Amino acid sequence: MGIRLYKAYTPGTRNRSVLEFNDITKTNPEKSLTYHRHRSKGRNNRGIITIRHRGGGHKRLCRLIDFTREKNIPATVASIEYDPNRNCRIALLYYKNGIKRYIIHPRGLSVGKEIVSSVEAPLSVGNSLPLNKIPLGTGIHNIELSPGQGGQLARAAGAVAQLIAKEGKFVTVRLPSGEVRLILKECWATIGQVGNVDANNITIGKAGRTRWLGKRPVVRGVVMNPVDHPHGGGEGRSPIGRPKPVSPWGKTALGAKTRKRKKYSDVLIIRRRKSA
């Protein structure tokens, strides 16, 4: 896995880079694990825009990803595939009982290796265990927040969390964002780091490539008319005329805290994530 840099053959290739696909072993997805999902393009059931800057993009086929893992059944890695819906790769597993499943591809997991999700599973990349069975300092991903709910944390490309303490019915985990929080020891996690670690190091290079991803242009409020945005209007390049920037609906933006003041997980968070 590496990054390929383009020369300035055209303005669109200047400063552009793409990921190489030499880790992909299969081109077409497993048909039984795919489905089509209607893309709302940011509109609600009345056709009104409820989420701005969405629409267009290349048509995608969704893959069914198993975040819970079949317990106590060994599985063999059949292939490593591309998934257009996420920035990491996915691995196709063939279980001993004939079931096929997709999982997030951990770094270092190759085709032909056997992995298992079990309380007694060995400590190797791709195996899934309860948090209380994992030694301190181990890198983990696909972490559950509630037992049996399926992995919800550390699932992006290159993400890895670290188990740093165990006490009582909780374990302490340092997440990729820098946040340190408590998680029930009965929750499961997968050993290792998510693959495709260079996904965040590419340069988009041109506006059209962002449109392929289904993202539409973002227009500054200060260049709009007063009817469209609180920052709009004025003669020439006018200031926003307010003490703080606001959203199109008048709420304080750019630095305003949006987290609920009394959220259930406040007592579980030891240290908040790093600020941008």
Swiss-Prot record:
The protein's assembly and partners: Part of the 50S ribosomal subunit.
- Name its cellular compartments: Plastid, Chloroplast
Q: Which domain of life is it from?
A: Eukaryota
**One matching Pfam family, short form?**
Ribosomal_L2
One GO BP annotation here?
mitochondrial translation
Q: Which residues form a coiled coil?
A: none
Chain spans, region Disordered: 225-256
Under the heading InterPro entries, the entry gives:
NA-bd_OB-fold, Rib_uL2_dom2, Ribosomal_uL2, Ribosomal_uL2_bac/org-type, Ribosomal_uL2_C, Ribosomal_uL2_CS, Ribosomal_uL2_dom3, Ribosomal_uL2_RNA-bd_dom
Q: Which organism is it from?
A: Mesostigma viride
Q: What is its main location?
A: plastid
- NCBIfam families from the entry? rplB_bact (TIGR01171)
GO cellular component: a single term = mitochondrial large ribosomal subunit
**Molecular-function GO term, any one:** transferase activity
Could you tell me the keywords of this UniProt record?
Chloroplast, Plastid, Ribonucleoprotein, Ribosomal protein
HAMAP family in alphabetical order: Ribosomal_uL2_B (MF_01320_B)
- Protein name, per record: Large ribosomal subunit protein uL2c
Q: Which PROSITE patterns match?
A: RIBOSOMAL_L2
Family as reported in the entry's similarity comment = Belongs to the universal ribosomal protein uL2 family.
